[in-house]
Design a protein with these regions (language model features):
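Metal-dependent enolase-superfamily TIM-barrel catalytic cores that perform enediolate-based chemistry
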Residues: 1-81
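Structural alpha-beta junctions
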Residues: 27-31, 56-58, 122-127, 148-154
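Flexible C-terminal active-site loop/helix
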Residues: 43, 132-182
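A general structural motif
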Residues: 63-67, 83-93, 105-115
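Catalytic cores of alpha/beta
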Residues: 43-53, 72, 90-99, 111-121, ...
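Anion (oxyanion) recognition and catalysis
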Residues: 77-78, 121-123
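Hydrophobic faces of well-ordered beta-strands that scaffold small-molecule active sites
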Residues: 1-5, 31-37, 60-63, 83-87, ...
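Short loop or secondary-structure boundary microenvironments that flank
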Residues: 9, 39, 109, 131-132
């Protein structure tokens, strides 16, 4: 099981540090933890969390700890602790080719999903399939890609945000219903 924790970007938040300790105290050994500050940390704060979590075996990664344009800082951190890129990949698509750690990939933003399908079947791929705001048709592709990735050479729990999808014909899982709504 994988737990994702969205954290704040406040520079001095001792409450979050206490929550982290509580999470680590109760998190079963088989669980994985992902921490997501949405690019809101300074290098100093990211380094503090890195120092705290460096030897934590349940940490899967910290997702986009620094602003998307702090590429140098992200590479420095990635040499110390697992870092997954998210917003940086949207702003700087060339990073998809050179970032060797995990990448949060949103097929609806990536373009042709067949290219991502080929990519996730490679042994050196560290893509994590995630959602944006898709219609029912896009959601079907995402579910297909996520299922392939989970069974692939580098399996990883996808970020599918279950239960967020609005109701209505555009978000229906049957393409015919979506098409008729359009």
């Amino acid at each position: 099981c994988t737990i994702k924790w969205k954290v704040s970007n406040q520079e001095n938040n001792s409450k979050e540090e206490k929550v982290l300790q509580k999470i680590l105290d109760i998190l079963p050994k088989k669980f994985k933890l992902r921490i997501d500050p949405n690019g809101g940390w300074s290098r100093q704060k990211a380094q503090e969390w890195s120092n705290e979590l460096r030897d934590e075996p349940r940490l899967e990664w910290i997702e986009q700890p620094l602003p998307s344009n702090d590429i140098e800082g992200l590479f420095v951190l990635a040499n110390q602790i697992p870092i997954a890129l998210d917003e940086s990949l949207v702003e700087f698509p060339h990073l998809k080719k050179i970032w060797k750690s995990w990448q949060i990939r949103r097929p609806a933003l990536d373009g042709d999903p067949r290219l991502l399908l080929k990519e996730i079947e490679r042994e050196d791929c560290h893509a994590v399939i995630s959602t944006a705001f898709e219609t029912g048709i896009g959601r079907r592709w995402i579910n297909h890609l996520a299922a392939r990735q989970v069974k692939g050479k580098n399996p990883c729990a996808p970020g599918l945000a279950p239960g967020w999808c609005p109701e209505g014909a555009l978000f229906h899982s049957n393409p015919k219903v979506v098409w008729e709504a359009v």
